[in-house]
């Protein structure tokens, strides 16, 4: 007869009176932290970052000389360096789902879950580096992806893809707030709807003040906090905690979890709780990459995340903001560092939840509560507070990126295109800020509606590819294929979306006999819908373009103009002409294509194939797996924290020197700068001579 409770270490989760009843859920409607802590985190951190980032932007304006024009607000001067771009990509791609859903799939499928989450969402960023270079080559003055669509394919196509891009921002924002509000509510008891409205508040404030540059600066600070928390949790699970503390303990417990001697009949098992062998895994083990559920999730993840990178204007805005020589390197580095966030974190907190035999229910897991449960079990209140802080950083950072993405679309693709084509820089800046405020309010309303409807983070994450995946290949063709035509782009994107949704719902009805949130959230219908959407969209566009090729030369995309020219003397926006040379950009494209494909093949094909012969991991193999997770997370954290500081050291020194310099001197220098700007604007030749002399000086400094 099976022992009850089955494990000594999880006795507290079982009630021995009148049998052996396991807790029906981990949280059970109770909270670990007070409501006051929840409000303090939401409002306190929000206010702090609003003030802090606004102060950093003011310091740059005051002591470095950056000018806050509409171009600067929406593009950050198009001169952001590799380290900060990589940090922004990591921060932008670290959603609530990255922290929460990755551990959910670890809880469901074992070691394959974190791997497929990380690899399935890294390759898109690596490959998007190609698009980032193509923007510099073919649309150097663009502000949004839809602006490029209109320049190439005209008004009808522009409207279609504007809808897809805005829909992507809505989907991503929904996931951020669903995950964030669920965790805040579970840990602190803050009202779910109040959390939905308050979380975006601080983001709106600092984005309003500083635009894209404030978003980038905040993203860096948020990224630092996320990576510090990541390293703490990884080392806690595998080195220092009393409950676990080593890969050997985690390994032994994961083996015991599926042992045949363990009874998983009522009342030990409850609907949806982890208990016994894993259906679809080799020998039911959590310690294997031979997992049908994990592989299907991996496919859904790959398809869905192509949509949320290629169709999210936020990534195009980051590419536009990057210095040409930094673009490809920033995206590659950002992708590789980001891999560690879901892989290392979920390999720790996700597998840790299983190794601790936590009574997490399916509903709790779907809402993203696996990581907070593990953090509480290992660290108590301090663990829940650290996890809450980490999640808040991820949600607000990615949320600010979505705000700027939507702001740019409303400003340049709606207001400047259809309402006021002759808009001045001041008018555009005003509309940008109104769009930030408006979408911030919409974010809160959207989260309330979805929570009322019972939509979970897990469901939304799997469904995103069905809704927006059909636009991926047409958008890629826009900059990569001269024959791609407008008719095929419209037909492919719209038809792919319709066919994807029909396939998704039909498969759910056929397999489960009903169409509801539960049946449509299963892997089978989700996989079918995702694949049909992305493949149909691409196939239709390709066929139409081969039948009637456009043979485009990108002349109209190169003619996109900036609203306000940057003034010479602004160091932050003087991009050397050398960086925009076609030959140099071609070399950069060849570099990112080569290394993007190498790392894509490595993490999607070679790594999983090499792990299959291990079948069920041995103790030594699991030690190796855990060490890779620890090392990747630690090294990635050091790089993403240190590199932006090294690259920006001159600016940091300028600000520090300026802060301790006599303010009268600074005012005189400001006056001199204004006079010089007026002179160069009045005499254009003077500006050309200045730029030539500046390039010569930089070359001499480099040679010296």
From Swiss-Prot:
Keywords, comma-separated and alphabetical: Cell membrane, Membrane, Symport, Transmembrane, Transmembrane helix, Transport
Taxonomic superkingdom: Eukaryota
PROSITE patterns named in the record: NA_SOLUT_SYMP_3 (PS50283)
One Pfam family named in its UniProt record: SSF
Keyword Transmembrane: yes
Keyword Transcription regulation: no
Disulfide-linked positions: none
Family stated for the protein in its record: Belongs to the sodium:solute symporter (SSF) (TC 2.A.21) family.
Name listed for the protein in its UniProt record: Urea-proton symporter DUR3
Lineage: Eukaryota, Viridiplantae, Streptophyta, Embryophyta, Tracheophyta
């Amino acid at each position: 007869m099976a022992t009850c409770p089955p494990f000594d270490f999880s006795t507290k989760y079982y009630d021995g009176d009148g049998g052996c009843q396991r807790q029906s859920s981990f949280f059970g409607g109770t909270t670990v932290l007070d409501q006051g802590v929840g409000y303090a985190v939401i409002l306190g951190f929000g206010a702090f970052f609003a003030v802090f980032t606004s102060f950093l932007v003011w310091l740059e304006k005051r002591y470095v000389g950056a000018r806050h024009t509409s171009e600067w607000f929406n593009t950050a001067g198009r001169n952001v360096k590799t380290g900060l771009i990589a940090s922004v990509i990591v921060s932008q791609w670290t959603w609530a789902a990255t922290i929460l859903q990755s551990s959910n799939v670890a809880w469901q499928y074992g070691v394959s879950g974190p791997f497929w989450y990380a690899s399935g969402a890294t390759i898109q960023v690596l490959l998007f580096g190609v698009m980032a270079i193509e923007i510099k080559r073919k649309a150097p003055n663009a502000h949004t992806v839809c602006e490029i669509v209109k320049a190439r394919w005209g008004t009808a196509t522009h409207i279609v893809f504007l809808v897809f891009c805005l829909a992507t921002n809505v989907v991503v924002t929904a996931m951020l707030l669903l995950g964030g509000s669920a965790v805040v509510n579970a840990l602190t008891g803050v009202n779910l709807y109040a959390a939905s409205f308050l979380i975006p508040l601080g983001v709106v404030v600092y984005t309003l003040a500083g635009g894209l540059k404030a978003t980038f600066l905040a993203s860096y600070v948020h990224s630092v906090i996320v990576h510090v928390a990541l390293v703490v949790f990884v080392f806690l699970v595998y080195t220092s905690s009393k409950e676990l503390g080593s890969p050997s303990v985690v390994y032994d417990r994961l083996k015991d979890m599926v042992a045949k001697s363990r009874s998983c009949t009522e009342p030990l098992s409850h609907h949806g709780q982890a208990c016994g062998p894993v259906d679809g895994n080799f020998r039911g083990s959590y310690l294997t990459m031979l997992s049908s559920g994990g592989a299907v999730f991996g496919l859904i993840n790959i398809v869905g995340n192509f949509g949320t990178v290629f169709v999210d204007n936020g990534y195009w805005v980051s590419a536009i903001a990057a210095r040409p020589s930094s673009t490809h390197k920033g995206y590659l580095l950002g992708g590789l560092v980001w891999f560690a966030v879901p892989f290392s974190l979920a390999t720790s907190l996700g597998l840790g939840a299983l190794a601790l035999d936590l009574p997490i229910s399916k509903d709790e897991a779907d809402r993203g509560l696996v990581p907070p449960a593990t953090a509480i079990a290992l660290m108590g209140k301090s663990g829940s507070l650290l996890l809450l802080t980490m999640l808040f950083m991820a949600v607000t950072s990615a949320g600010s990126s979505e705000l700027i993405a939507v702001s740019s679309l409303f400003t340049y693709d709606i207001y400047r295109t259809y309402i006021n084509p002759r808009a001045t820089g001041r008018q555009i800046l005003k509309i940008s800020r109104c769009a930030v405020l408006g979408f911030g309010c919409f974010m809160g309303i959207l989260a309330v509606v979805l929570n009322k409807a019972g939509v979970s983070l897990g469901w939304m994450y799997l469904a995103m590819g069905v809704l927006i995946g059909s636009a991926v290949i047409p958008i890629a063709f826009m900059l990569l294929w001269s024959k791609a035509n407008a008719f095929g782009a419209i037909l492919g994107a719209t038809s792919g979306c319709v066919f994807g949704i029909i396939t998704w719902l039909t498969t759910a009805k056929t397999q489960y006999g009903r169409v509801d949130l539960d049946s449509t959230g299963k892997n089978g219908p989700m996989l079918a819908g995702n694949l049909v959407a992305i493949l149909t969209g691409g196939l239709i566009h390709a066929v139409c373009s081969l039948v009637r090729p456009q043979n485009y030369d990108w002349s109209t995309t190169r003619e996109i103009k900036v609203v306000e020219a940057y003034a010479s003397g602004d160091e932050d926006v003087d991009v050397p002409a050398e960086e925009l040379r076609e030959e140099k950009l071609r070399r950069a494209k060849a570099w990112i294509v080569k290394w993007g494909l190498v790392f894509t093949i490595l993490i999607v094909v070679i790594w999983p194939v090499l792990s299959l012969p291990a079948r069920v991991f041995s103790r030594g193999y699991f030690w190796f797996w855990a060490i890779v997770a620890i090392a990747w997370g630690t090294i990635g954290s050091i790089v993403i924290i240190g590199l932006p500081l090294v690259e920006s050291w001159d600016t940091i020194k300028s600000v520090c020197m300026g802060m301790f310099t006599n303010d009268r001197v600074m005012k005189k220098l400001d006056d001199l700068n204004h006079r010089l700007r007026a002179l160069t604007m009045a005499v254009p030749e003077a500006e050309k001579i200045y730029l030539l002399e500046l390039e010569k000086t930089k070359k001499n400094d480099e040679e010296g």
